[in-house]
Amino acid sequence: DPLTGLFNRWQMYKRLETCISRYTQHKLQTLTVAMGDIDFFKHVNDTYGHDAGDEVLRTLSRLFRTIMDKKGYVCRWGGEEFLFLFPDMDMDEVQLLMSDLLDDIRHTPVLYERKLIHVTMTFGVEEFGRNHTMESVIQEADRKLYLGKESGRNRVIY
């Protein structure tokens, strides 16, 4: 993705395809997907302008790259949505990482034109299982993301 430096959607599809293949061949024990969305991002753009919104996306992307280093993959799925992929990470590890990620996002203000912009994110997490397809695991993570939005935002739904 040119703005964030993260994988784009197409690159992540390829990565996910490879991981699913490894999972079905029993080369991976677990495979978990998380869909995340910046809460009230439209408000950031409307209040501070689209350049500020771009800076929020870049700042969070740098944070994601640091956190995800050697743990998994992250891409900008579109707009203010991000998809995370955790191969061979058990659910306890995923929950700990997601909890840390929520805290880090909350405590990483974005400096734009001498103003600090604070954002939060909501996530939906789904573990890949034998009855999933690539599309269905993403759809289920996305469905859980929207449950999190409906139940107050700034949270992770498993």
What residue spans do the PLM features occupy?
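A short pre-motif secondary-structure segment
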Residues: Y73-R76, I117
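Active-site-proximal alpha-helical element of nucleotidyl cyclase-like catalytic domains
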Residues: T18, A52-Y73, E81, D100, ...
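Conserved nucleotide-binding and Mg2+-coordinating catalytic segments in signaling enzymes
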Residues: D1-K14, G36-H50, R58
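Short regulatory alpha-helical coupling segments
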Residues: R9-Q29, S61-D69, P87
